Amino acid sequence: MSIKKDYDVIVVGAGSMGMAAGYYLSKQGVKTLLVDSFHPPHTNGSHHGDTRIIRHAYGEGREYVPFALRAQELWYELEKETHHKIFTKTGVLVFGPKGEAPFVAETMEAAKEHSLDVDLLEGSEINKRWPGVTVPENYNAIFEKNSGVLFSENCIRAYRELAEANGAKVLTYTPVEDFEIAEDFVKIQTAYGSFTASKLIVSMGAWNSKLLSKLNIEIPLQPYRQVVGFFECDEKKYSNTHGYPAFMVEVPTGIYYGFPSFGGCGLKIGYHTYGQKIDPDTINREFGIYPEDEGNIRKFLETYMPGATGELKSGDVCMYTKTPDEHFVIDLHPQFSNVAIAAGFSGHGFKFSSVVGETLSQLAVTGKTEHDISIFSINRPALKQKETI
């Protein structure tokens, strides 16, 4: 194959974060090469399954709110630039038992601190407003009106098309075999030969856990197998067209998340947990191989959304890549300021991929970013742990 060998920036891993970075680099006229082991968007990483929730009031920590709001701005901008559908404002409903749901409580505090437009609801109000939901009286909720659903594969598809239109090159089905780094020079080795640049962005998803060591970086990253299911439901209660929102629910058995039915696809639901530890190269991608793949989420639906317990229409398997504290890693390499790292998004990263891409592009071009990414430092104490939970 014939492809130029020297670039300003090479992006290794052209999934959620990397493809966004490639777009923002190419938009500035930066000569960019994106290299991926597959053909993004694809079904081998953490971005497939059609949809992802974007929340602004953030139960994982109110420090994320400005990052989430900037991500939303960028998603709106992307939608203006492409013919692909990027975002639908469904609203996001977060609920759980009052006084026993710290995720819900932090979501409410984040909304209050940042003056977000939300409704606070009691159990009976939840049941009345959304007849598809059945919750006890002692539950409360926060409904965030301006949040909603991102169409994840479309997001990556749009970023790729726009980046390529700007002159970026995307090299697919090309695993990176090795890296060579100096202060103002990087080289990657692939089956198609070597490629060089002055800057490098590494965003390899679950494969960060295996390959960052080649860059002399040791971060405790653990990939996990994650599943979602699509269930037949009462479309008049659970469809987007009838006003059903995306949701996050914290109950005694854990945290669940889901989406309204779009175009009859069924209600989509997942159990936000860290299940089987896996190797991304050998993960079993067959939904239903474990009884709990369907069992856990069906049991939740039977209790809280009984009109969505029809036949399983389909199921998907993807991956979470967890850090010990479940916060991201977005930073420069400790020894080489010409290398930026994005890793460990711990099952809640996709919504931020627009702003992460912007941040990575800024780090690559100027060595700094306008965004506060101190919580994502590669040098934070939590990353000194040898084992993940």
From Swiss-Prot:
Enzyme class, spelled out: oxidoreductase
Q: Which residues carry this modification: S-8alpha-FAD cysteine?
A: 318
Q: Consequence of mutating residue 13 to A? A: Loss of activity
Q: What is the effect of changing residue 14 to L/W/Y?
A: Weak activity
Per the record, what are the reactions this protein catalyses?
sarcosine + O2 + H2O = formaldehyde + glycine + H2O2
Q: Which domain of life is it from?
A: Bacteria
Record: residues binding FAD: 8-38
Report the Pfam families cross-referenced here.
Answer: DAO
SUPFAM superfamilies in alphabetical order: FAD-linked reductases, C-terminal domain, FAD/NAD(P)-binding domain
Molecular function GO terms recorded: flavin adenine dinucleotide binding; sarcosine oxidase activity
**Keyword field:** Cytoplasm, FAD, Flavoprotein, Oxidoreductase
Misc. comment: Decreases in function by replacement in the G-X-G-X-X-G motif are suppressed by chloride or bromide ion.
- Spell out the NCBIfam families in the cross-references: PRK11259.1, soxA_mon
Subunit and partners: Monomer.
Family, similarity comment = Belongs to the MSOX/MTOX family. MSOX subfamily.
| UniProt-recorded name of the protein | Monomeric sarcosine oxidase
Originating species: Arthrobacter sp. (strain TE1826)
